[in-house]
Regions:
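An accessory alpha-helical subdomain
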Residues: 162, 166-242
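Catalytic cores of RNA-modifying enzymes
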Residues: 1-184, 188, 240
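Generic C-terminal helix-cap and adjacent flexible tail
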Residues: 245-247
Length: 247
């Protein structure tokens, strides 16, 4: 990112203040990190590339508010933070969101690939509607803000980008019997998004819940929404399905 004017807008969307500890994932050369350090109490600058980590430490040595952390954010222990303002590598976007959905935070502001961001709020039944849509709906309020011009990046990407904000839903919009199992269930059943529920759910019953083929067949015939196609179910319907399996 070579256009620093976008940093102010990102921090505005995050309502960043002097009490915040902010996570910057994929801190790179530290341009955004330095800007964040002027706005909040502390910044956790996480970078997986050891060469960039050395650059970060050289560039940010004069900022005691910044803690440079080397490693994959998905695999290492991270100190407590309450906000995220970041331009993460696009290839980790879905895994990063799943990781964040299991953390406590007040606000997350990210620059994401626009095509990916559209999946977060896709209408039920649409081409972009999928497991990520359902999990985002369950965990967070998601808002799309402004497009980010390709000229703001160096090198310029081939894809369009957009600023997105996520804020946790409290309480959750519906109840599920097991949050971790819900994630696995939705990911699993959407591999058969065009099939009817009674057929799409059988691999989950056999391979995850360890039901016999006979038990899976019997369960599939009695489930709610069994004759609906997976892609036509609303997020709440997936919660009802899992709860029915757990009852």
């Amino acid at each position: 990112m070579i256009e620093s004017s976008i940093f102010q807008r990102m921090t505005d969307y995050a309502s960043l203040n002097r009490d915040d500890v902010t996570l910057d994932v994929g801190a790179g050369l530290g341009f955004l990190t330095r800007f964040l350090a002027e706005m909040c109490r502390g910044v956790l600058a996480v970078e997986a590339d050891d060469r960039l980590v050395e650059v970060l430490r050289e560039q940010l040595w004069d900022l005691p508010k910044v803690e440079v952390i080397e490693g994959n954010v998905l695999k290492i222990q991270i100190p407590v933070f309450n906000k995220v303002v970041s331009i993460p590598p696009y290839q980790v976007s879905s895994r990063l969101l799943l990781w964040l959905f299991n953390k406590s935070f007040n606000s997350v502001v990210l620059i994401l690939q626009k095509e990916f961001a559209n999946r977060l709020t896709a209408p039920v039944g649409s081409e972009n509607y999928g497991w990520l849509t359902v999990l985002t709906y369950y965990h967070a309020e998601c808002e799309h803000f402004e497009d980010v011009p390709k000229s703001f990046f160096y090198p310029q990407p081939d894809v369009d980008s957009i600023i997105v904000r996520l804020e946790p839903k409290k309480p959750a919009p519906f109840t599920v019997s097991n949050r971790m199992l819900f994630t696995k269930f939705v990911q699993n059943i959407f591999t058969e998004r065009n099939r009817k529920v009674r057929n799409a759910i059988r691999p989950f019953l056999r391979n995850v819940l360890m039901r016999t083929a006979e038990e899976a067949e019997k369960t599939a015939r009695t489930l709610p929404f069994r004759d609906e196609r997976v892609r036509h179910l609303a997020p709440e319907d997936f919660g009802a399905l899992l709860n029915a399996l757990s009852s």
